[in-house]
Curated annotation (Swiss-Prot):
Phylogenetic placement of the source organism: Bacteria, Pseudomonadati, Bacteroidota, Bacteroidia, Bacteroidales
Subunit-level organization: Homodimer.
Catalytic activity: (2-aminoethyl)phosphonate + pyruvate = phosphonoacetaldehyde + L-alanine
Enzyme class: transferase
Gene: phnW
PANTHER family assigned to the protein according to its UniProt record, in alphabetical order: 2-AMINOETHYLPHOSPHONATE--PYRUVATE TRANSAMINASE
GO terms for MF: 2-aminoethylphosphonate-pyruvate transaminase activity
EC number: 2.6.1.37
GO biological process, one term: organic phosphonate catabolic process
Role played: Involved in phosphonate degradation.
Membrane-spanning residues: none
Name of protein: 2-aminoethylphosphonate--pyruvate transaminase
NCBIfam families to which the protein is assigned, alphabetical: PhnW-AepZ, PRK13479.1, transamin_PhnW
This protein's UniProt keywords: Aminotransferase, Pyridoxal phosphate, Pyruvate, Transferase
Pfam family membership, one: Aminotran_5
Native organism: Bacteroides fragilis (strain ATCC 25285 / DSM 2151 / CCUG 4856 / JCM 11019 / LMG 10263 / NCTC 9343 / Onslow / VPI 2553 / EN-2)
Length: 362
């Protein structure tokens, strides 16, 4: 198979050194794995998330990022609580599906996919609905690439004392933030996003006091984040059920490479430059971005089809043959395709992509 760059929002292109770390087998009960790898990366994750490391902890959970979203909703929302979900895309809507499955009392505020979650609307809703106890939203909604106003939304949620759940699947590690300063109670992300690991597990950065309140609440055995956390705490990195050892080791290497790059701020700068090179190049070819620049994230970029009758499959195949894999669109109101800016990819890769697009008959 011809190698190619994954210009997708995860799974994504990983470094050779991340791949190479998966060539070794690890014993799940040995301290070489649990103490020196799992416990170490749990602490590193908290250190990336906040300077207030004593107040927060991390839980790792097998499966995709959605497993972690479901685990948090299923354990943090008690039977007497009410969840407000603010959605402007498929992943916010998925939170509603999870709440529906668990028969959780919830309300979903739906916003247009090309508009940010409205801070004023959420503020007004909370002022008139005091029964809401928890609020959840997606930071970077990869349905379109829109970036929701995290700081402003967190402020209006925390002012009346509500608990805050943030799906930072496609932003944590790639966009600077401090969960303590923002007042986030549960932040959710995944190994195969901005940290640049491979798929296989997700993680939750949780306020310790709120995680303790999850004891006995979970609606699922395998997704019980309190039980998972307690086992990891007492067992010094031990997982309740078989852990994805190779994926975890690759993630540890990816964390090392994040630090070597200069941390989240440096990675954010690279992603922003990737996005800039991509957008300027595509616009020079006549392509139009779906979103206004002011609300666009540097994570993934949506482009409108350039003309009626545009054959995305043929376009995709042509780019793949030249070493680039992109993403189809995910919204119903417009025909789009998406190009991810994250992973072990650099501005020169996007300059090369633009030249390939220029040479492609579309």
């Amino acid at each position: 198979m011809k190698p190619y760059l994954l210009l997708t929002p995860g799974p994504l292109t990983t470094s050779e050194t991340v791949k190479e770390t998966m060539m070794t087998d690890w014993c799940t009960w040995d301290e070489d794995y649990n103490l020196h790898i799992v416990e170490s990366l749990r602490k590193e994750l908290v250190g990336i998330a906040t300077r207030n490391t004593e107040e927060y902890t991390s839980v790792l959970l097998q499966g995709s990022g959605t497993y972690c979203v479901e685990a948090v909703i299923g354990a943090a929302i008690g039977k007497n609580d009410k969840l407000l979900i603010c959605s402007n895309g498929a992943y916010g809507d998925r939170m509603g599906n999870i709440a529906e499955y668990y028969h959780i009392d919830y309300e979903l505020l739906a916003f247009d996919e090309t508009e940010q979650v409205s801070v004023d609307y959420v503020d007004d809703y909370l002022s008139n609905n005091s029964d809401v106890t928890h609020v959840a939203f997606v930071h970077c909604e990869t349905t379109t690439g829109i970036l929701n106003p995290l700081k402003e939304l967190a402020h209006v949620v925390k002012m009346p004392g509500k608990k805050l759940i943030v799906d930072a699947m496609s932003s944590f590690g790639g966009i600077p933030m401090d969960v303590s300063e923002l007042g986030i109670d549960f932040l959710i992300s995944s190994a195969n996003k901005c940290i640049q690991g491979v798929p296989g597990f997700g993680f939750i950065i949780a306020r310790r006091s709120e995680l303790v309140r999850c004891k006995g609440v979970a609606r699922s055995l395998s997704l019980d984040i309190y039980d998972q956390w307690e086992t990891m705490e007492k067992g010094h990195g031990k997982w309740r059920f078989t852990s994805p050892t190779h994926v975890v080791r690759a993630f540890k290497q990816a964390l090392t490479e994040l630090i070597e790059e200069g941390g989240v701020e440096a990675r954010h700068r690279r992603y922003c430059e990737n996005h800039r090179v991509l957008v300027e190049g595509m616009r020079s070819l006549g392509f139009v971005t779906l979103l206004d620049d002011a609300i666009q994230s540097p994570i993934i970029t949506s482009f409108l089809y350039p003309k009626t009758g545009f054959d995305f499959k043929a376009f995709y195949t042509a780019l793949k043959s030249k070493g680039f894999v992109i993403y189809p669109g995910k919204i119903s109101k417009a025909d789009t395709f998406r190009i991810g800016n994250i992973g072990d990819v650099h501005p020169e890769d996007f300059a090369r992509l633009v030249e390939v697009v220029r040479e492609t008959e579309y």
